[in-house]
Amino acid sequence: MRLIASDLRSGVERLGDMIAEAKTIVPFTGAGISTECGIPDFRSPGGIWTRNRPIPFDGFVASQEARDESWRRRFAMEETFAAARPGRGHRALASLYRAGKVPAVITQNIDNLHQASGFAHEHVIELHGNTTYARCVGCGQTYQLDWVKRRFDQDGAPNCTVCDEPVKTATISFGQMMPEEEMQRATALSRACDLFIAIGSSLVVWPAAGFPMMAKRAGARLVIINREPTEQDDIADLVIRHDIGETLGPFVGN
């Protein structure tokens, strides 16, 4: 039976009961968990993609001009990403992780804030990659961004020193294949949990938006925490339409 929390307090109390009763909790996070940390949303009105049209993967690979523009945009955002620190939502999930309730987090975010909050790298399933380092699109060789920046300042967007294919941020661009291993791990986790908490996601980007449904079909209870309604509110057991930091803040340190 779906419950839309009438106020923040009742929502937090019900969420606390569900967390206490759960054995295995899988959080699924979207952009909303990071906006209080200063990371701008990409998709919402006024977001980055409304100001700069996304560069698709095939365009990046085919055009030096597109690669230069992609890296110019990334370095223009460097201060924002470098200054960001985990918010209350990240820290609350890390507390549940340390307590053994959360085996891993599934995220659509690329900002590395779950790792910064205390999650081991191998326990953060990044569906859309990570913008804090770079990877060759050919052989997969990884590079630190300071190396890319030095090359970029000298000669524009660099190619791989191993195979001479283009180097891009280790994120998933439009038209690029989703990471198979991460999708498989996210599927297994969604099917194995007894509480799935979707946080700060509009739940419209597929295939990632399928994980809450998958967990629900497998018998898990579903919580959705998002300021705006989502298309999956009707199947949720609890919907909390309040600030994420305020909602999850009471669970920091528990």
From Swiss-Prot:
CDD domains attached to this UniProt entry: SIRT7
Keyword entries, A-Z: Cytoplasm, Metal-binding, NAD, Transferase, Zinc
Q: Where does the chain bind NAD(+)?
A: A31, T35, F42, R43, Q108, I110, D111, H128, S201, S202, N226, D243, I244
Q: Where does Zn(2+) bind?
A: C136, C139, C160, C163
Q: Which gene encodes it?
A: cobB1
Task: From the UniProt record, list the reaction(s) this protein catalyses.
Answer: N(6)-acetyl-L-lysyl-[protein] + NAD(+) + H2O = 2''-O-acetyl-ADP-D-ribose + nicotinamide + L-lysyl-[protein]
Q: Name one GO molecular function term.
A: zinc ion binding
What protein am I looking at?
A: NAD-dependent protein deacetylase 1
Any binding details for the cofactor? Binds 1 zinc ion per subunit.
The record lists the organism as: Bradyrhizobium diazoefficiens (strain JCM 10833 / BCRC 13528 / IAM 13628 / NBRC 14792 / USDA 110)
InterPro entries (UniProt xref): DHS-like_NAD/FAD-binding_dom, NAD-dep_sirtuin_deacylases, Sirtuin, Sirtuin_class_U, Ssirtuin_cat_dom
UniProt key word Cytoplasm? yes
